[in-house]
């Protein structure tokens, strides 16, 4: 995924929420995405852990 992609994010106890990627940072353990959500327009960071399906919080929207 890259900047300006439409995504959905997994949050605690609720349905996936739509957002837009503002920034991407790659790490050896995975990737951090700064995602603008409706109630966080300046963005909030989410981490996708490499190699662990349970550690995937950001997915590209269809």
UniProtKB/Swiss-Prot annotation:
InterPro entries: Dextransucrase_DSRB (IPR019717). Pfam families: DSRB (PF10781). Belongs to the DsrB family. NCBIfam families: PRK10708.1. HAMAP family: DsrB. This is Protein DsrB. It comes from Shigella flexneri.
């Amino acid at each position: 995924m890259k900047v300006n992609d439409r995504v959905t994010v997994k949050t605690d106890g609720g349905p996936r929420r739509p957002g837009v990627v503002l920034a991407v940072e790659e790490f050896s353990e995975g990737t951090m995405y700064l995602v603008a959500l409706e109630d966080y327009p300046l963005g909030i960071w989410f981490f996708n852990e490499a190699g662990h399906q349970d550690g995937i919080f950001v997915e590209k929207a269809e």
